[in-house]
Design a protein with these regions (language model features):
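A structural boundary/capping signal
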Residues: 1-173
Length: 173
């Protein structure tokens, strides 16, 4: 029992160093600074849950993307598309901002967000970005003071929306 405890402590000391090295490799893999956000989320997940299998993350996102893709029509306006995506995620699937326990670490670990359907602005925005990537929607993240939101990069006018507030569409003011 004591050996098992010592081994566990050694592993817990090694894992953060390995993850830091992997984050460094990820950052260097794209000199333009546009590195793979999904890989970064997986590394972050391993920091909080080192023994958890992360392959289910991509599978869960693929399934959600398949479901929402069937609901979006090609002739919809960008605003209608965003409304359909956010209605699917925040009303049909029940994702929401964790307003009660905002600082719960599980709000930052993506598998926990998918399981609990609760997150913080950046993880819920990442969810929209990941689904957008899978179904061909130009959704990117936007950092604001005190908040992280998502933007649909429309050719006519960008559409800003707040995943933490159930996808509420925002004005540019």
């Amino acid at each position: 029992l004591k050996i098992k405890s010592i081994a566990s402590e050694i592993i817990q000391a090694i894992i953060p160093r390995q993850l830091l090295r992997q984050f460094g490799q990820l950052a260097k893999s794209s000199p333009s600074g546009h590195w793979n956000l999904e890989k970064g989320v997986i590394l972050l997940q391993k920091f909080g849950y080192p023994d958890e299998e992360t392959s289910s993350l991509s599978q869960s996102l693929d399934l959600l993307a398949k479901e929402v893709s069937a609901l979006i029509e090609h002739n919809q306006s960008p605003e209608q598309t965003i409304q359909r995506l956010t209605r699917f995620l925040f009303f049909e699937k029940g994702f929401e901002g964790n307003q009660i326990d905002f600082f719960d670490p599980d709000n930052t670990y993506f598998l926990r967000v998918l399981d609990r359907r609760k997150g913080i602005p950046i993880t819920l925005s990442a969810l929209c970005i990941f689904l957008g990537q899978r179904i061909g929607l130009p959704i990117v993240g936007v950092g604001l003071p005190g908040r992280y939101i998502a933007k649909y990069e429309s050719l006519t006018q960008p559409i800003y929306f707040d995943p933490f507030d159930k996808g509420r569409i925002l004005s540019q003011e």
